[in-house]
Amino acid sequence: MLYIYIKTQNALVQRINFNLDSQELPQNILWIDLLHPSAAEIAFISSEFNLEFPTKEEREEIELSAKYWEDNATITINAHFLVRDLKNDEEDRNLIKLRTEIVTFATAKNILFTIRYNEFSTFEEIQARILASPKNFEDGFDIIDKMFEVRVEKDADLLEWIDKEARRLRTSVLEKKDEYSYDEMLKDISSLQELNMRVRDSLFDKRRAMTSLLKSDKIDKDIKQNLTIVLKDLNSLVEFSVSQLNILDNIQTILASQINIEQNKIIKIFTVATVAMMPPTLIGTVYGMNFKFMPELELHYAYPIVLGVMVISIILPLVVFKKKGWL
């Protein structure tokens, strides 16, 4: 699908659902958004505007040169967008699952071109802003500027959610030890660490693109000034994500210590039980020997006496352990 945003004579912005077969390209184009484009649509736009869009393989390359490149007429950016899926599991705990989608931005003749294969809330928000406040969007670079600003805000929201969950986990570990399982807690910590690293990678990707845009002579002074402000916010978020990783590592350390304490308690119980059972075991072993000459076996009260000695030999170590504070 091709969505074309054009500037009208009364300084408003109009959105057109463009059809290749029945329409001609309008004048005063601000933005061409290619959503789930067909090969014919990409070929048409490439031919009309003398553009060369990256292939799927080029979009997925990790080299810096594949993320941003610029020539005399165009700028092309392959940016990573995080898509957030919120769903509840069987225990009604909110879990966030992220996936990474690549969006291609290209500029030519002050027109913005975007290629994407999924719906994004960022695009919906930008589209609403353009239609509501068209005077703030004079060309495609204004849209890119606001696009990065909104994306950084979205990443900030994700980091705030991660921070909230990390604090909840810390409270659970310290104050509600009996209300969770260690396996569940470790899984939650691991999930938050993975989310944090994904958001941080997304921030790094935006920082590289914004830094390159600031070096471009195609960007005017006002946009560069706003990008600089957004870049400062982004750097603060990177530092915040690092502090969150440290918090999660701290929670994991506390949890590991608690697991060790629980294991030590179990080992202590088995150790005490083993030591307490050694004397009666020894007594039983002695009197279980098949020697012919064991005169005490002939005594009338031998059996209850031996049982009593065995019970005393169990109780005595337990009393000693209790006084020592080992129980």
UniProtKB/Swiss-Prot annotation:
Keywords: Cell inner membrane, Cell membrane, Ion transport, Magnesium, Membrane, Transmembrane, Transmembrane helix, Transport. One of its GO terms (molecular function) is nickel cation transmembrane transporter activity. The central ion permeation pathway is formed by the first transmembrane domain from each of the five subunits. Mg(2+) binding strengthens interactions between subunits and leads to the formation of a symmetrical homopentamer surrounding a closed ion permeation pathway. Low Mg(2+) concentrations trigger both a conformation change within each subunit and a loosening of the interactions between subunits. This results in an open ion conduction pathway. In addition, this results in a less symmetrical shape of the whole complex. Its main location: membrane. The record marks 264 as: Essential for ion permeation. It is found in: Cell inner membrane. A motif (Probable selectivity filter) lies at residues 288-290. It comes from the Bacteria. GO terms for cellular component: plasma membrane. It catalyses: Mg(2+)(in) = Mg(2+)(out). The gene is corA. It holds the Pfam family CorA. This is Magnesium transport protein CorA. Homopentamer. In the absence of Mg(2+), interactions between subunits are weakened, and dimers, trimers and tetramers can be observed in vitro. Belongs to the CorA metal ion transporter (MIT) (TC 1.A.35) family. It is a multi-pass membrane protein. The chain crosses the membrane at residues 269-289, 301-321. Mediates influx of magnesium ions. Alternates between open and closed states. Activated by low cytoplasmic Mg(2+) levels. Inactive when cytoplasmic Mg(2+) levels are high.
